[in-house]
Swiss-Prot record:
UniProt-annotated location(s): Cytoplasm
Name listed for the protein in its UniProt record: Protein-L-isoaspartate O-methyltransferase
Family named by the database record: Belongs to the methyltransferase superfamily. L-isoaspartyl/D-aspartyl protein methyltransferase family.
InterPro entries from the UniProt entry: PCMT, SAM-dependent_MTases_sf
Main location: cytoplasm
GO CC entries: cytoplasm
Complex formation: Monomer.
NCBIfam families per the UniProt record, alphabetical: pimt, PRK00312.1
Length: 208
């Protein structure tokens, strides 16, 4: 049984068009309040983005669900996340696939996320402090790549690290941002625009 607050959020997400029950089950299973500061715990199950420090945010649950659904994951999917942040999106992915690779440019956030994931007994995640623009070449290719911050254009390195048939989901743009889905097929990249969004920028380089 899920709490009334969790059920209310799930009902809202279904009303917004989220159809993948496995994704919804993952959202219900991950305690979002563990990924926000105490001051925001009462708002943890509201369908809003919340600040996590360092100028970053934990994404709105709808956007987490939408982007995850667009990845078309199976348990065997090899997944790369760019922007570990709080670790919340990472935890959702870890409930859906056997292993997740995640890159974070801010070391303090990476450490906090690793601690949260460990406290929740989610050990099927590898995190790395590095430049998200470069992906994780040593672990490539990936069946799915998700980016939780917006570059002004799609990073070439991420496209080349997709396996055949793989899917990349990311926000793209500066003043005006759009969620894009990129599918690699036969040496070509098919790009679909999903909807208008608002994310923090994907900054190049790594930060100590």
């Amino acid at each position: 049984m899920v709490s009334r607050r969790v059920q209310a959020l799930l009902d809202q997400l279904r009303a917004q068009g989220i159809q993948d029950e496995q994704v919804l089950n993952a959202l219900a299973a991950v305690p979002r309040e563990k990924f926000v500061d105490e001051a925001f715990e009462q708002k943890a199950w509201d369908n809003i983005a919340l600040p996590i420090g360092q100028g970053q945010t934990i994404s709105q649950p709808y956007m987490v669900a939408r982007m995850t659904e667009l990845l078309e994951l199976t348990p065997q999917s090899r997944v790369l996340e760019i922007g570990t942040g709080s670790g919340y999106q990472t935890a959702i992915l870890a409930h859906l696939v056997q292993h997740v690779c995640s890159v974070e440019r801010i070391k303090g956030l990476q450490w906090q996320a690793r601690r949260r994931l460990k406290n929740l007994d989610l050990h099927n995640v590898s995190t790395r402090h590095g430049d998200g623009w470069q992906g994780w070449q040593a672990r490539a290719p990936f069946d799915a790549i998700i980016v939780t911050a917006a570059p002004p254009e799609i990073p070439t390195a991420l496209m080349t690290q997709l396996d055949e048939g793989g899917i990349l989901v990311l926000p793209v743009g500066e003043e005006h941002q759009y969620l894009k889905r990129v599918r690699r097929r036969g040496g070509e990249f098919i790009i679909d625009t999903v909807e208008a969004v608002r994310f923090v920028p994907l900054v190049k380089g790594e930060l100590a």
